[in-house]
């Protein structure tokens, strides 16, 4: 693989050819078989992974030949049963073929991405969750509408093959991919003609399909944004384990009016702000209501013509920033005007200017979170804490760890929001529910549990919040802490409760369109 990368750097044209012979490299399937064993060792007993199941490379060659014939004599997905006792050897060969196919396709894809970021000194790689917080902290002086779009994830297999065909010249190497995609579609329970490319099964193959599909979607969007806003954007490549995103460069340029000696300094700030996490993307644009409607109509139509798929109307929602409050990414998002008084003194004259900028004001959805906690049996509908009876069979440490994990994820994810006082109500519900769960387990009362454990009860749970919200030394520092927002970079994903609440909001929008 390293040699292939080196040759591809010397001649970027040959990387699109001669991919098919790589499918018959024995080292490739040895690597893919090791990856399969490493991924399954955590969920399967070790006795089923003994050395008696020898890996035969001849069987893999025969498997590839059957895929090329397309006679449906081999079934890759139906026989991939999670039960290790049911035809496990056939499942291992199928997974090895998928791993090998993914490894071959990743090589030109990664080289292509490497060329797109070459020469960029300030390029950095972030996970997609970390691109949300700079977007929420960004100023929106030239935007008055926001569009919340969900990327369609149901797509025809042939469209996926065509996206690979645009940058891979070796057509025979795509025949196994086409056969596998069609077989996966035929083996699924639904009778639809499309397949789901969202990686519900966390495999290397489906992660690669999803990242490549999102890469194509955003590459189209970038070209449109460049033409509409005349902004200079840097397109960052997407490696198989990373997420494609875009970072704008802001600079100042000088232009002059006709028939005038005055020069005007203008800020070359793009009128379109973009961020994506998972299947959701947010675009903040400037324009009238008619212009926003044109954008809302043009972008889905362009994507439909490019990918030959239909977008449901409820997947694109537009809101006016100054009037409406939208829900996205687990927040209630609204805009607020932030006035700034600027005083400039030149000789004896004093100029005063008022600058007004718009910024996001993310709000914690307290009532929906309490509703989700009641659904998970942490409290009732009114928010009164109750014991988690399903956890009484666990140890005390496991119970404390689980409550600690829930509160830590909630507090870290919403720590940068304004008006965090509602989070302390969530803290009260979780802490009292934890105490009631321990009391129910030991068949005692909350008072006895608090008396026996004392400060050790919540030594691990809810301790991070004390460190972050420690009282400052001065009132000026206290006022500053209320104005500033602190985002924690150790958030791996959207909070599960926020994700569930967002699904409920999406279902409400879908029901409105169905009526």
From Swiss-Prot:
Subcellular location, record wording: Plastid, Chloroplast
GO molecular function: RNA binding
GO biological processes: mRNA processing; RNA splicing; tRNA processing
Keywords from the named record: Chloroplast, mRNA processing, Plastid, RNA-binding, tRNA processing
Keyword Cell membrane part of the UniProt annotation: no
InterPro entries: Domain_X (IPR024937), Maturase_MatK (IPR002866), Maturase_MatK_N (IPR024942)
Recorded superkingdom: Eukaryota
Gene Ontology terms: cellular component: chloroplast
Pfam families for the chain: Intron_maturas2, MatK_N
Main location: plastid
Known role: Usually encoded in the trnK tRNA gene intron. Probably assists in splicing its own and other chloroplast group II introns.
Family that this chain belongs to: Belongs to the intron maturase 2 family. MatK subfamily.
This protein's name: Maturase K
Organism per entry: Picea glauca (White spruce)
Organism taxonomic ancestry: Eukaryota, Viridiplantae, Streptophyta, Embryophyta, Tracheophyta
